[in-house]
Amino acid sequence: MDALRAVAFYALFVFLWSLPCCQSAALISQKRSKGARSAFDGQRSHKFLKEILASSPGASRRDDFKDPVVPHDYMISIYRTYSAAEKLGLNASFFRSSKSANTITSFVDKGKDDLTLSPLRRQTYLFDVSTLSDKEELVGAELRIFRKSPGDVQPSPSGVYNLHLLSCRSERPLASRSIDLQDSRKAEWEVLDVWGIFKHRHQENQLCLQLKVTYGKSDTEIDLKQLGFHRHSRTQQERAILVVYTRSKKRENLFNEMKEKIKSRGDDDEEESALQFKARRRRRTALNNRHGKRHGKKSKSRCSKKALHVNFKELGWDDWIIAPLDYEAYHCEGVCDFPLRSHLEPTNHAIIQTLMNSMDPNSTPPSCCVPTKLSPISILYIDSGNNVVYKQYEDMVVEQCGCR
């Protein structure tokens, strides 16, 4: 999965550099004329990706994940909420404390009940958090535990029960909260703030937590089965999830992210150099093809925003991208000739360059039609650890075009 995502990002970057003039930042168009050559011709693209996957240590691991990943309802809800906000033009950044995050990663509990224990005094939760990167700033974390409708539970004088979250190693208290079963005996999610846990995690790949419940001022531990915290007959959607909120320490670049993924797979310098050579060759071919087209009728149109529909399923990315399966990216196309229109918001340099080009086209190239304003989109995808991740990627949709 990691290899496929890396290749996908790499292919995306190569195309970005292939757009007219100044390599404007737009995504790959699936619509092209039948006779037109393209650096991403179907057969060549498939062969290119196949070569990289075959040489990747992660390629063999991709077939190991036979069980389909089912996204948790909570993650789907997050995606729908923030993608809807983006469509309304609102700031879709969600927040934790006074900081904003652009990534939410969900880790599903891998623990199992010991059916020999009756009553069940402790519930153990296991999470594989090896995919968390130290290059991202942690800005929040919460443990979401589904509590089924309680059965015949030992009565509490106040009706209030205390949830205690402990570390498996030291039984050090990590978080706590109270629930009132007199007010609510229906099934619901209990949420514990576990941000502080990661301050003591020390780069461990496995996170082990234990839950116990007491009532009143008593230290007596209540049978968790009676309270509805047992795992028996639970669906995948009812398993506990650890939700981690992170923020990139710097503005993300898809190409840089792809390079980091190649390094994490352990590829040697020779393989990386080969990829860079292929990228340069394809970029040159793409630029030559596109420059050749600019002598046609389409080159007469002025710089403006054009349609560019991206279909992730047609690209073969739907095995790791959950949503959206397609979106409108747009791109900038057209000439920047003199006099430049004010709505194109040309820079002073672009105005001078365009004027020089109008007087002597052979000595000065024209200014470039490029995106001047871009917006983000939300993507829900599966990472290399088979965890479902929500991420907000910047600069994915062209909003305005201009001459630069």
Curated annotation (Swiss-Prot):
Residues 1-24 form the signal peptide. Glycans are attached at N91. The keyword Glycoprotein applies. Its main location: secreted. The keyword Membrane does not apply. One of its GO terms (biological process) is embryonic camera-type eye development. It is found in: Secreted. Pfam families: TGF_beta, TGFb_propeptide. First expressed in late gastrula stage embryos (9.5 hours post fertilization (hpf)) in anterior neuroectoderm corresponding to the future dorsal part of the brain. Shortly after tailbud formation (11 hpf), expression expands to the entire neural region and is subsequently expressed in derivatives of the lateral neural plate and migrating neural crest cells, with the future midbrain and hindbrain showing strong expression. Also expressed weakly and transiently in the posterior embryo from 11.5 hpf to 15 hpf in the lateral mesoderm, and in ectoderm above the neural keel. Disulfide bonds join C303-C369, C332-C401, C336-C403. Growth factor that controls proliferation and cellular differentiation in the retina. Plays a key role in regulating apoptosis during retinal development. Establishes dorsal-ventral positional information in the retina and controls the formation of the retinotectal map. Functions maternally in dorsal/ventral patterning to induce the expression of the zygotic bmp2b and bmp4 genes and ventralize embryos. Zygotic expression does not appear to regulate axis specification, but instead functions to establish the integrity of the axial vessels during embryonic development. PANTHER family: GROWTH_DIFFERENTIATION FACTOR 6, TGF-BETA FAMILY. Homodimer; disulfide-linked. This is Growth/differentiation factor 6-A. It comes from Danio rerio.
